């Protein structure tokens, strides 16, 4: 029998046996508390953020493994800036400002899940998300910063980040 995969979105470090987890894994005959404990241990560094988690179960042996994904880019931006939520009116209401270093940090976290081939392209994706949330970058309109990236203004930062 092949393994079954259950995918859920849980709050980092705070998974509970209730929905969405309990109903999803209960029918598989697993010890729900054991699964919850393992998920909480694996996601504690993402406290306060919604984290995608895959539970891979062997229905015969009842063995399971946990794969923790990276939270959505918007969640990482909110955590970096200490925001509760993004702007309801991103064109008119600015809720925060990211530095280029913060953009690069988030891009490095998300890079494996992005279609971007370079760190620069990944950073531009993060900046696009910031734009839709009402977050400026380096105190400027995110579109302006994307143009500056294309012009090579931040090349030194990217080269340094690539080496880390």
From Swiss-Prot:
Disulfide bonds: none annotated. SUPFAM superfamilies: Ribosomal L11/L12e N-terminal domain, Ribosomal protein L11, C-terminal domain. CDD domains: Ribosomal_L11. GO terms for molecular function: large ribosomal subunit rRNA binding; structural constituent of ribosome. The keyword Protein transport does not apply. Forms part of the ribosomal stalk which helps the ribosome interact with GTP-bound translation factors. Belongs to the universal ribosomal protein uL11 family. HAMAP family: Ribosomal_uL11. This is Large ribosomal subunit protein uL11. It comes from Pyrococcus abyssi (strain GE5 / Orsay).
């Amino acid at each position: 029998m092949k393994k079954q995969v259950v995918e859920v979105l849980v709050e980092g470090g705070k998974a509970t046996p209730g929905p969405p987890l309990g109903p999803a894994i209960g029918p598989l005959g697993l010890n729900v508390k054991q699964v919850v404990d393992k998920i909480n241990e694996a996601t504690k560094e993402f406290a306060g953020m919604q984290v995608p988690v895959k539970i891979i179960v062997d229905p015969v042996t009842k063995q399971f493994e946990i794969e923790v994904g990276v939270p959505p880019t918007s969640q990482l931006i909110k955590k970096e800036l200490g925001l509760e939520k993004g702007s309801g009116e991103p064109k008119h209401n600015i809720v925060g400002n990211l530095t280029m270093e913060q953009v690069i940090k988030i891009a490095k976290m998300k890079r494996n899940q992005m279609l971007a081939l370079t760190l620069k392209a990944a950073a531009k994706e993060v900046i696009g998300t910031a734009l839709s949330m009402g977050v400026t970058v380096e105190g400027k309109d995110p579109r302006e910063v994307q143009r500056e990236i294309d012009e090579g203004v931040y090349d030194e930062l990217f080269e340094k980040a690539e080496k880390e």
